[in-house]
Amino acid sequence: MFRHELLKAGIPLLLGIMNVALGILMLTYWLFVHHWAYVSKSMLYLGILTTDLGAWFCLETGSSILLSQNPVFHSYASRILLLLLPIPFMMFVRHYLKAKDQYLCRIFVWLDVAEIAVVLFLQLMDIRDLTQTLWMTHVMIGLAVLYFIYTICNKFYHHTTTHALWICTIGSIILIGALFSDMFNYYQGAQDIGPAGRIAMLLFIVTLACDTAFVSLKEIDAGRRAALYRELAEKDLLTGCYNRNAYQPVQKTDKSSVVCI
C-alpha cells in the first residue's frame, strides 16, 4: 500500500518539481537579462509565481505527506505557500497585459497582504488554525482570478487585442477550470488534487514563459538599437569624435544653473 501511494503520487510530484525548476530558471534568466538592459518585470513575477506554485504542488502530493518527518510543519508550509500565491499572480497579470488601472491591482494586493497578516495573527494567537482560515485564502485567490478576468475584458472592450491577450484568454479558461476542480475536490474531502489540472497549468506557464522571454528579447534588441542610434547621433562616423549634439544636455544644464546678479 505504501509503495502504491508513492507510485500514484509520482506524476504530480514530478510536475511540481518541474514547476519549481522552471520558476528558478525564469528568475535566473530575468536577473541575468536585467543587468544588460531594461526589461519588464513580468518574467520576474512569473518566476516567483511558478516557484511558489510548484513548491505547493510538491507539498500537496500524497508521497510528500507520507515521507514527511514533521507533518505539522509540512501542513503549515503548504498553507503559507498558498497564502502567497495571489500577489505575484496579480503583479504578473498587470505587467504582462500592461494593465492601465492605477488603483485596482494595488487595492487587491494590499487586501491580500492584510489577509496574510490576519491569518498569521490568528494562528500565532491560537485563535484560529491555518486550516480553519483557509476559506479566506480561497476568497483572495478568487479575487485574483476576477482581476485577471477584468483585465482581459477591459482589453477587449478598448480593442487593444494582442497575442498576449489571446494567450491569457485561453489560459483563463484552463485556470478557472483547474481552480474550480481543485476547490471542489478539497471541499469534498480529497487529500490530493488530480494531475490533469497540474498538467494544464504547467503547459500554460510554459507558454507564458516562452512568450515573456520572446518579449524580453525584443526589449533588449530595442534598447541596443536605441543606444546605437544615440551613439550615431552624438559621434562623427569618420573621426569618432563627439559632435555638438552630445553637448546639448550639458549646455541646458549650464544655462539652468546661471544666476543673474
Q: What is each stretch, according to the model?
A:
Residues 1-8:
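Soluble non-transmembrane domains of integral membrane proteins
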Residues 10-216:
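Juxtamembrane segments at transmembrane-helix boundaries
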Residues 149-152, 247-251:
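Generic hydrophobic alpha-helical segments
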Residues 214-234:
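Cytosolic signal-transmission helices at domain junctions
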Residues 227-249, 261:
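Conserved nucleotide-binding and Mg2+-coordinating catalytic segments in signaling enzymes
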Residues 252-256:
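Cytosolic nucleotide-binding catalytic cores of signal-transduction proteins
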